[in-house]
Amino acid sequence: MPVNMISKLLEKAVLPALDVAPPVKIGGPRRTSVLRNPNMEKLQKGYLFPEISIKREEHLKKYPDAKVISLGIGDTTEPIPSIVTSAMAEYALALSTPEGYQGYGPEQGHKNLRKEIADKVYPDMGIKESEVFISDGAQCDIARLQTLFGPNVTIAVQDPTFPGYVDNGVIMGQTGKADDGGRYAGIEYMRCAPENAFFPDLSRVRRTDVIFFCSPNNPTGHAASREQLRQLVELARRNGSIIVFDSAYSSYISSSSSSSTPRSIYEIPGAREVAIEVSSFSKFAGFTGVRLGWAVVPDELLYSDGVPVARDFDRVVCTCFNGASGIAQAGGVACLSTEEGRGAVARVVGVYRENARVLVETFRSLGKEVHGGGDAPYVWVRFPGRRSWDVFAEILEKTHVITVPGSGFGPGGEGFIRVSAFNSRDKVLEACQRLKSFLA
């Protein structure tokens, strides 16, 4: 019997039994019989920041000689301090010797870095090194936490907020479809606007299993007060919810305001029983390309059945992640372990903080309603009656300056743009001059 005839007979006999459709080819490329994850179809357009990169490339094709200045994506531009890069170089060089070579490290991270984070980032908060999980960045931790929670949890997010919380939830199957206004069914959107001082009315927030909360907030730049975070923790304790607190920008909270504006959720009594904190070396040490972050999962945080959340998160980390780069972790230790290292990264943060101040002054001088920029590297500017993408496009067209449309952070961002302080001082000053010429 010919081979092709045998194949056809096998398809008829086996495929129906497996309830699998055979590969198809209908006037185009051959397709597999694998069904697409239906949750991917729910996602709106592309992810925000790659979409902006596409707009930039289109603009440069139109204006090939344009000197584009990016005040868009939050990517650092200042060099990493030499005390940090020297530590990474020394670690990397040691890998070329028999004595210094190291392969896989602990999935949870090197013990010395976990201890430095517990001692230096969370002094007097009772955080143990065993509760710190080193990662390749806060955004990756958000995805791993969504894997941990699974598809059956309900989630709440600030509106506007970092889009990764929502998109990961959609991919995991935690939501329904988006309506015409961009709101996904099944997500509780906590409105954070100038009218409520960028903090939601918690008495009107529907109970959810997980609450994503970013402070200082990306994109609004608002840093929640101690009293506001006390209310948030109280809500979580009352409802039996888990807070995922994103403190990636906590180093931008000035020392003068730190007494009233916590840098960590664990400064609030009772938070250890209801909160996970994720953070990153990206924005305070310039590690956007190096990739290093961490999550804190306290021992006291338990599921409804009494199982520690940390036990399951450890399993997720061990299953999905082989640990952060040892070279990157050596840099993290250098950032925290000495006064010189801490001072060096603080000076870098100071550059961006001053850039934010210049941006705030520029927009205020133009009569614009401006928020943020004090305890965060982002400035949130309102353009009443305008659509965010239209404002973004007009500024790019007229000034060759890239911003971020506020609607990309959720429906509550419509009518705003986010302006980033992450660029060199010269370029920020040049961008401000262009904006003044256009908006005056």
Swiss-Prot record:
One of its GO terms (molecular function) is transaminase activity. Its cofactor is pyridoxal 5'-phosphate. Its EC number is 2.6.1.-. InterPro entries: Aminotransferase_I/II_large (IPR004839), DapL/ALD1 (IPR019942), PyrdxlP-dep_Trfase (IPR015424), PyrdxlP-dep_Trfase_major (IPR015421), PyrdxlP-dep_Trfase_small (IPR015422). Pyridoxal 5'-phosphate binds at Y104, N218, D246, Y249, S280, S282, R291. One of its GO terms (biological process) is defense response. Keywords: Aminotransferase, Plant defense, Pyridoxal phosphate, Transferase. It holds the Pfam family Aminotran_1_2. Belongs to the class-I pyridoxal-phosphate-dependent aminotransferase family. LL-diaminopimelate aminotransferase subfamily. Probable aminotransferase that may generate amino-acid-derived defense signals and be involved in resistance to pathogens. This is Aminotransferase ALD1 homolog. The gene is ALD1.
